[in-house]
Amino acid sequence: MQTATGPVAMNVLMHGKAYDPAQAFAAIAPVASTYMIVVAGVNQPYDDLAGLAAYSKATPGKVSYASAGVGAVPHIGTEFVNLKLDGGLTHVPYRGESQFIPDLLSGTVSSAMMIAGSALPLIKSGKLKPLAVTASRRSPALPDVKTLDEQGVGATLPLWWGFIAPTGTPPAILDKVNRDLREVLADPALRKRYADMVLEVPPESTPAQFQASMVDEAAKWADMVRKTRITLTAE
């Protein structure tokens, strides 16, 4: 089975979910990772997070951020940025990135945190401008854009995907699938396709290391939800 940042980090926080996915499944291996970019329309009067927060404070109630939905990773991430910078941004939830992009381009909403693969083409074409990247280091595609950490947020918010198995799967099977996935990920053709989609091959990880990483991710996002006081409700 495949999993990602959202299910592992968020489901445990939602009412009605009786299990912690980081404990209910056995980790196999991470297979891809990327980052997000905080963006704004090119006509907005700010170029970084400090400018966004300052403009919001100067125009109370007028500055907003779009998200792909309540409880989505970008929603929690942006709300944490909002909290750390005391930005006073208003959340405007949509049903996915494609739904809010027209409003972001027109200035109907002021900003958004988008997946890099979706945001970069719009940035390169001059339709959006980047304010920050959520990776632990600056993006080679945007070397002049500072990370969240560099702008005082104190957080790194990567996105990742990986494979898991039911709890109780024999360790020998987990190890074998882990090795098989490593071989697949070493393929130069696959790595080129990843690069085209703004994805990275994660460092090699044992099942135990990936399991620990999932637990850490769930704890990190739980802490952000607690600090921002966001309520997540399962349907």
Describe each region flagged by the PLM:
Residues 1-2, 59-63, 87, 105-114, ...:
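Alpha-to-beta junction loops
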Residues 2, 26, 62-66, 200, ...:
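Short, well-ordered beta-strand elements
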Residues 12-99, 146-148, 153, 158-193:
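Hinge/capping helix and adjacent helix->loop/strand transition within the periplasmic-binding protein
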Residues 26, 127-140:
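Conserved helix-loop-beta element of the AMP-binding
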Residues 124, 171-235:
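An extracytoplasmic/periplasmic, membrane-proximal ligand-sensing/linker region
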